[in-house]
Amino acid sequence: MKQWKLFCLCALVSAPIYAQFTYPSCNPLQQSEFQATELFNKTGANSAQATNSGLNEPVQFDVQGVYNTNGDSVLYTNIYFVERKGKVKYYDGLAKRVDSIGFIPNWGYQSSNNSNDNGLMGIVLDPNFNTNKWIYFWYTPTIPGAAATGASSNANRRLRLSRITLTAQNRLDMASEKILIDVLGSKTDQYHCGGPMTFDRNGDLWVTIGNNSNDLNGSGSQYAGQTSTSPTATDSNNSGEWGSANTASIRGGVIRIHPDNAATTVRTDRSGTYGPGYTVPAGNFGDYWAGQFDQSNPTLAAQYRDPSKVLPEVYIKGTRSNYSVAVHPTKGWLAWGDVQYNATNDEYNLVTHPAFTGMPYFMANNTPTPAGSIVLPTGHSAATPINASLMNSGVRNLPPATPALIWYGTTTTQTTMNNNVAISGPIYSYNRNLKSSVKFPPHLNNSWVLMTVYGSPSSGQMYIAMLDSINPVLQGTPQQQGTAGVVRFNVRNPLQAKYGPEGALYILNYGSTGAYGSGNNPGISRINYTGSCQLAAVPIAKNTRAANLNVSMFVDGLVVHEGGSHEFSMIDLNGHQIFTVKGIGETRYSFPKLSAQFGFKKGVYLARVQSNQGVFTRKVSLL
């Protein structure tokens, strides 16, 4: 495992625990510079909290910013969140009140069995929500005519991605529901249905979907019994090869689509219906791996381009129970947490391109999972995984398994993170042009929030890991819980965290009791930074040139004519610093090469050169 710097966010303490977070010209962070406020909880009894909350299993949320008339500053934030049993609720940040705004019928409510992952599992607001009022939901719809137990209707279980519009009265208009994806679920299993979603800066929607399988049978194998039995004679419940390792299945991975109301394409297969209402961005799993295999195995490359063999929506395969997702705001790196083999081995993943992450064959650092009585095909390894199951309708030869970035459980000696559910929080990108007095400071630029749920302590934990500024790896060495450098906030089994439009951190606490219950005091909190280290905005409306700093522009780059040292940065129009590199002497910078290295896309940016001779800035368009 790569070395990594880890800081715990648990109960509030008074020690100077932020000391290891530093930034040039600013003091090290202090605990007193952060203010944690519980916006509302289950009872809402505190007058400072929202009234009428009455929470019951809140699982996911999103934050809406209400802006000033100039549109450049957040006045306050509203929160939309869902409860697993189907209620959609709204926290009014101005009135400080929680109200129910709708109910989505779902199998988690219809079924009398509460111990499952079915229900209303995900919510995300459209990037243009303030004008179009669109909300996306991931849920397991009700089964028409099914009894409360649902035992006679297992074959009709489904997984669904929908878009619903709010009315002018801020209520769900169920008649407006637009179903984007509707597929069959497991016939007998109710677990690992996924649901967390996020949008990236390109307007692409990322959706996590677990393997929708309990994937353990009597032998303890993740995939036993499914390579020798006809899929028509048995259910796929006990097979990870049916979902996680099946490239033609939506289950066991992460999908990426681009919602487009004008898109009319509809595709159906044996599992369900895809579309209309979205397009598929280039560069997903099939596109990427076809390109990788073009030279070495053209026949296999052709299979990866076949939409009947590789689902076009798929970006990641090989997950088990991934109930979190985050995308780096500027670099586009994809992060998620996954509950791995036997629910005792968890991992955090961070990738820069489509990948197969191992399940059901491998976990953690590509440690094999138990195969039970199954004899794996000749040639099967982490470098050349093979899905030979009769349950497999996708490609047989999978890409090399990508190991996790962080893992813990029976396969590691990492004891500071030993809980039962790995949840990826957001990755922070400091925006110096954002007008906000509470946004997190530049010390935490490129930091990644990690969370654990249940286990010991039963309330879960939160950490901040610092990422390398260029590559998706972690910095530093482990910090043990309780030592200097540990950051602490109060959490009660945190299921989700995300940064709001004002740069504050929001945390959803499921509650301190176990899963599938009303929970002991669930709620949502906000953490504001109240310190003094905020950087001045970067001017992006005009070009500047220092009298003694000689920089020459050319078609696709620039040359710094400088005898000493300098820094070259690329900044987007929101003030996010895409990257910074240091140079000495005369240096030529090629925009296409830098784009390939740092992963920024076409658009308008500010190129910035700084040395002891001054500062040079120029708006550039990358086509």
Describe the role of every protein-language-model region.
Residues 41-86, 420-424:
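Beta-strand-rich domains and repeat architectures in extracellular enzymes and scaffolds
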